[in-house]
């Protein structure tokens, strides 16, 4: 074979030509071909090819007049050294190659189509499964919901059947058994025991709802004989039906104790019962809904001296409370007066039995006007504490403001001029009638309140005053800061970004920082470090569970957590009660103004002139920080600012602006804006005398005059007090 395979007229199936890119080749026939020509030509013809070797082996050379064979470029490959390898073949071989390539492509397309069809079928199967599962779950829910709906329908039907209009006219009530009936005409003490047993048999449920309907059993009206001033109690049995508790109905009995009003009134009670002194006291509590309440009967003609329970009186208007004395039946107040074992009282959680010791007698004084009640002493008949007076605790349902303004007093001798008693908009006189251990004042006792004479303690009227002063001593004062801020950039440095940063947190924390502008020469944002430093301080204060109060510790932790490059001055202040704690590093500062004068201010910290002390990563804040402690009063003004304020305005100028703004009742935000604007206005001046010009002159820079135009950030805080 020749040096180049292309010279062989009977070439192997593929002709391989190594060559470099754009390298020309000369064939013996004088035709030159380059690499691009090989690539672009679809078919090459070699004619008049003569072997360069003139050897005698003519067997490898074609005949001289043989026709040129057609061949085409099959592929080209670039090697690592930059050379190219071309593969040529005749027409039949190229056709075979193309057919094989087409078959491979068809197989690949069919494979992809099969995969797509399989995926589509899988998705459709999943969708069918999902739809079927949803249908099954919905069917199950409907099946499970059907019984509950049916029970509700049954309950509603039962409820309608129970609430028949004929029930209102009946004089007896059937409870659980037909033989347990209460005759409203002939009820006696023996019937009360059956009522108690029925009440105890009521099922108790934690989920018991409030009574929806309360049906009173009315009896025929009849006149009650006058009982003079003896105490009389009416016990009514109310049937509360149709209460749905845990899916079943239950009937509950509510025992209500009501005081009698006048002796010659027509009363429509359920039953009037004379309480037996020998009746055993049962202290088994029922549900909270079945409380013994003292309320007037709806069918009575109410007089102005109507007695109200404590729970009702708290929901009445001020005018109604002013006209009516209140019987306090709360457990807390009565237990403070008497022993619980000897004098049981009507508690919010009602007891099943009603004994003579549980009745609160109504004194003769309740039938007089408010002025007469105020003038008459309230007599305590208890044997143990005959001279004891009380101060009623604050009502549960009243607000904090009402409880501080109202003074509830029970005393045997109240000194007043009549006007305060008539108004009674601020003071309530709670009338209490107590009973003795032996039951000397009872329903059957003829002893009257007017006949009882007990000594009146002279110091009784002083106890409410002591209690009121004690409540005043509990009122504490909390100090807080009402703050506003203003931050103005330097016109010359506005393009480089904001260099100042600040924060205000929880009405008792403020902070301010001034980034060092020289960092901008190194391509670092001069304000990034200051902003991250203040942001970390605010996070530490907000997230601190132990309520950290030392500003030095806050600044120390913030420096350790700050990752940005740069440096900054910093000032952190914290108000703890009335003491202001400040940690300062650099030429930012603070001042406290009280009554138009400077109470306290900070001193700038410099390495030398125009080179303030600053903090950066790795600094020991505990050693660098300068700490201040200032005791504040209400009305003081705290100012924290960067050097842009203190370099351009003297302290007396700042005080003048603040005091003038206070006279105009301006808010801290507005004052901060005025102070910052004035500082930048002076900073633009070339002639005014400024603190910065004075400092430059002291350092030997006599040529500088006027202000120093710089960024200004100011926080103005008013010290205020809130009562707790």
Curated annotation (Swiss-Prot):
Residues 357-385 are annotated as: Disordered. One of its GO terms (molecular function) is metal ion binding. Mn(2+) 1 binds at residues 514-515. The keyword Isomerase does not apply. Its EC number is 3.1.3.16. Its cofactor is Mg(2+); Mn(2+). This is Probable protein phosphatase 2C 62. It comes from Arabidopsis thaliana (Mouse-ear cress). The lineage of its organism: Eukaryota, Viridiplantae, Streptophyta, Embryophyta, Tracheophyta.
């Amino acid at each position: 074979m020749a040096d180049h395979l292309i010279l062989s007229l009977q070439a192997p199936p593929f002709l391989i030509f190594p060559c470099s890119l754009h390298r020309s080749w000369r064939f013996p026939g004088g035709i030159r071909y380059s690499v691009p020509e090989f690539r672009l030509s679809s078919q090459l013809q070699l004619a008049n090819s003569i072997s360069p070797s003139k050897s005698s082996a003519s067997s490898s050379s074609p005949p001289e007049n043989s026709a040129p064979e057609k061949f085409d470029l099959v592929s080209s490959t670039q090697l690592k050294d930059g050379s190219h390898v071309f593969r040529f073949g005749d027409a039949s071989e190229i056709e075979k190659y193309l057919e094989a390539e087409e078959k491979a492509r068809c197989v690949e397309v069919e494979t992809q189509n099969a995969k797509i069809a399989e995926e589509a079928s899988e998705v459709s199967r999943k969708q069918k499964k999902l739809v079927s599962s949803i249908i099954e779950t919905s069917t199950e829910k409907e099946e499970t919901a059907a019984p509950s709906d049916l029970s509700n329908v049954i309950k509603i039907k039962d409820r309608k059947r129970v609430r028949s209009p004929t029930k209102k006219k009946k004089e007896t009530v059937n409870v659980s058994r037909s033989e347990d009936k209460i005759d409203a005409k002939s009820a006696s003490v023996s019937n009360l025991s059956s009522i108690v047993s029925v009440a105890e048999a009521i099922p108790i449920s934690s989920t018991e709802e409030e009574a929806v309907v309360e049906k009173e059993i009315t009896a025929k009206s009849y006149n009650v004989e006058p009982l003079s001033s003896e105490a009389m109690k009416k016990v009514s049995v109310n049937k509360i039906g149709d209460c749905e508790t845990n899916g079943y109905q239950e009937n509950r009995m509510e025992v209500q104790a009501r005081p009698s009003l006048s002796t010659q009134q027509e009363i429509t009670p359920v039953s009037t019962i004379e309480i037996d002194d020998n009746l055993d006291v049962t202290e088994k509590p029922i549900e909270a809904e079945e409380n013994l309440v003292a309320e007037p009967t709806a069918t009575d003609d109410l007089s102005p001296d109507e007695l109200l329970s404590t729970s009702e009186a708290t929901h009445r208007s001020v005018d109604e409370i002013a006209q009516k004395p209140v019987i306090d039946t709360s457990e807390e107040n009565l237990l403070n007066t008497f022993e619980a074992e000897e004098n049981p009282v009507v508690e919010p959680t009602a007891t099943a039995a009603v004994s003579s010791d549980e009745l609160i007698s109504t004194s003769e004084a309740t039938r007089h006007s408010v002025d007469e009640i105020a003038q008459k002493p309230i007599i305590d008949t208890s044997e143990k504490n005959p001279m004891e007076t009380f101060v009623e605790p604050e009502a549960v349902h009243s607000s904090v403001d009402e409880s501080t303004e109202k003074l509830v007093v029970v005393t045997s001798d109240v000194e007043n001029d009549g006007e305060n008693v008539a108004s009674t908009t601020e003071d309530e006189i709670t009338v209490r009638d107590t009973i003795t251990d032996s039951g000397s004042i009872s329903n059957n006792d003829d002893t009257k309140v007017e006949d009882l004479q007990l000594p009146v303690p002279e110091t009784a009227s002083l106890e409410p005053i002591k209690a009121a002063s004690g409540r005043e001593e509990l009122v504490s004062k909390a100090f807080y800061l009402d703050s506003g801020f203003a931050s103005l950039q330097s016109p010359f440095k506005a393009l480089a970004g904001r260099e100042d940063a600040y924060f205000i947190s929880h009405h008792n924390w403020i902070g301010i920082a001034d980034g060092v502008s020289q960092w901008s020469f190194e391509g670092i944002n001069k304000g990034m470090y200051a902003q991250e430093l203040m942001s970390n301080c605010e996070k530490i204060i907000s997230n601190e569970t132990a309520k950290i109060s030392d500003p030095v510790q806050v600044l120390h932790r913030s420096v350790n957590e700050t990752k940005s490059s740069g440096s900054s001055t910093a000032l952190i202040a914290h108000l703890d009660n009335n003491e202001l704690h400040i940690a300062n590093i650099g030429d930012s500062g603070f001042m406290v103004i009280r009554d138009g004068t400077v109470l306290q201010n900070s001193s700038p910290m410099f390495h030398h002139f125009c080179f303030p002390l600053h903090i950066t990563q790795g600094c020991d804040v505990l050693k660098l920080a300068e700490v201040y402690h200032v005791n504040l009063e209400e009305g003081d003004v705290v100012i924290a600012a960067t050097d842009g304020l203190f370099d351009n305005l003297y302290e007396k100028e700042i005080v003048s602006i603040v005091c003038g703004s206070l006279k105009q009742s301006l808010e801290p935000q507005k004052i901060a804006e005025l102070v910052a604007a004035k500082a930048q206005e002076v900073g633009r001046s070339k002639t005014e005398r400024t603190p910065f010009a004075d400092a430059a002159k002291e350092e030997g820079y006599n040529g500088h005059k006027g202000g120093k135009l710089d960024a200004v950030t100011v926080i103005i805080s008013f010290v205020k007090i809130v009562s707790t």
